[in-house]
Swiss-Prot record:
<dbReference type="GO" id="GO:0006097">
    <property type="term" value="P:glyoxylate cycle"/>
</dbReference>
<feature type="binding site">
    <location>
        <position position="99"/>
    </location>
    <ligand>
        <name>D-threo-isocitrate</name>
    </ligand>
</feature>
<comment type="function">
    <text>Catalyzes the oxidative decarboxylation of isocitrate to 2-oxoglutarate and carbon dioxide with the concomitant reduction of NADP(+).</text>
</comment>
<dbReference type="InterPro" id="IPR040978">
    <property type="entry name" value="Isocitrate_DH_TT1725_C"/>
</dbReference>
<feature type="binding site">
    <location>
        <position position="232"/>
    </location>
    <ligand>
        <name>Mg(2+)</name>
    </ligand>
</feature>
<keyword id="KW-0479">Metal-binding</keyword>
<dbReference type="GO" id="GO:0006099">
    <property type="term" value="P:tricarboxylic acid cycle"/>
</dbReference>
<dbReference type="GO" id="GO:0004450">
    <property type="term" value="F:isocitrate dehydrogenase (NADP+) activity"/>
</dbReference>
<keyword id="KW-0460">Magnesium</keyword>
<dbReference type="Pfam" id="PF00180">
    <property type="entry name" value="Iso_dh"/>
</dbReference>
<dbReference type="GO" id="GO:0051287">
    <property type="term" value="F:NAD binding"/>
</dbReference>
<keyword id="KW-0464">Manganese</keyword>
<keyword id="KW-0329">Glyoxylate bypass</keyword>
<dbReference type="GO" id="GO:0004449">
    <property type="term" value="F:isocitrate dehydrogenase (NAD+) activity"/>
</dbReference>
<feature type="site" description="Critical for catalysis">
    <location>
        <position position="175"/>
    </location>
</feature>
<dbReference type="GO" id="GO:0006102">
    <property type="term" value="P:isocitrate metabolic process"/>
</dbReference>
<keyword id="KW-0560">Oxidoreductase</keyword>
Amino acid sequence: MAEFTPITIAYGDGIGPEIMEAVLYILRKAEARIRLETIEVGEKLYVKHYSSGISEQSWESIERTGVILKAPITTPQGGGYKSLNVTIRKTLQLFANIRPSVSFYPFTKTLHPNLNLTIIRENEEDLYAGIEYRQTHNMYESVKLISRTGCEKIIRYAFEYAVKNNRKKVTCLSKDNIMKFSDGIFHKVFNEIAKEYPQINNEHYIIDIGTARLATKPEIFDVIVTSNLYGDIISDVAAEISGSVGLAGSANIGEHYAMFEAVHGSAPDIAGQDIANPSGLLNAAIMMLVHIGQGDIATLIENAWKKTIEDGMHTADIYNKDHSTKKVGTKEFAEEVVKRLGQKPEKLAKADYPLVTKKQESNTTYKINTKEVKKLVGTDIFVGMNVASAHDIADKVNKLDIGNFELKTISSKGLKLWPRDTRFETISDHWCCRFMAKDGVELKHLDITKLLETLSKANIDFIKVENLFEFDGAAGYSLAQGE
């Protein structure tokens, strides 16, 4: 008797329920060996005051099955709500987001008939973590966190993916010409790990020119690895130029759990009209079937889907008079795929997945390097003061006894404004005061707390503290522009 794999299903919001019904219909007709557990997430939970969009009962189902197929959800805009996608990815430690983009030319309209690439996006870190603060009346902050171990995991995964899938090149995208620490470590780790895979070509682009090349010459790319926010943006670019965002599915992979979803959003403006393309979620389901070792069913469905595309049965988003035979709705598209189960495409590449898929694993143990000598050399204290000039703050601070520190610079938004030859006025209530240790002084954390107490007594409103360290003598902090 065939073994059935338990799968958690989330219908989502907007067009989610109708495309999920279409996909489940195809899975049933293809006799996928799965047992479904349905959970409620997204908008219905948000209105019940679940700020994360998911309940404890839903978590229990995901933890029980280990695999979730999720339709798009709607995250309410504005404060008070957290993205469910980000919450699931981070909670389940789904560190790798895999997003293939393939052209189905001439059956779908595209300027790039040879497009065939995969974007591997880091899934847990970066600005996408959503760590944000309002610090003053005027200033808002979003924190970008990148770890060496996070870089190592995703970059090694990308090279292993290239090896496993007979890819020839891995391209890294970053902005390390500006963000020399966060994006800098991503690029540095890429260069280190690339040396371990001499059979795979490697290259690096700055994200802006890399995105431009992706939009105009996508055929030059094979596998792209990048950080979270960049990956989110460029994967939509790749999906769009392939013919339709509605065709792209994605996998979110961790050590113990996996989530599969369409790349596109919930599109509430077309919900309930039976016009949405279910292909993105269907392709995600195909990736899920491969992941759980049902490559035979994945092959059956993908070949039927490609034959449907070849035969011109197209939803509105990809319909064109040159290669489309009939404009079909969501339900009819699913029915057309089912009619072609057992058939194979004639021009598009035929799918042929192995029955049992070996999980992509790494024997590497990721550890934090603590061998570098870490030395406290100063502190950046951010203050909230509505003054016309940094000189006003400097005049006030320099009248105080600041112990083992000396005030080196005052900056705003990364631009040094003191000391300068002239009093430069700027509109700001958010200032960074850089205090460095006096010559010959070995700083302790107690020195910083004393400094904060001194500032507080002087009615200087400190709003944030960033301590400055050297690691093996190298500065672990950036300089302000002009410093």
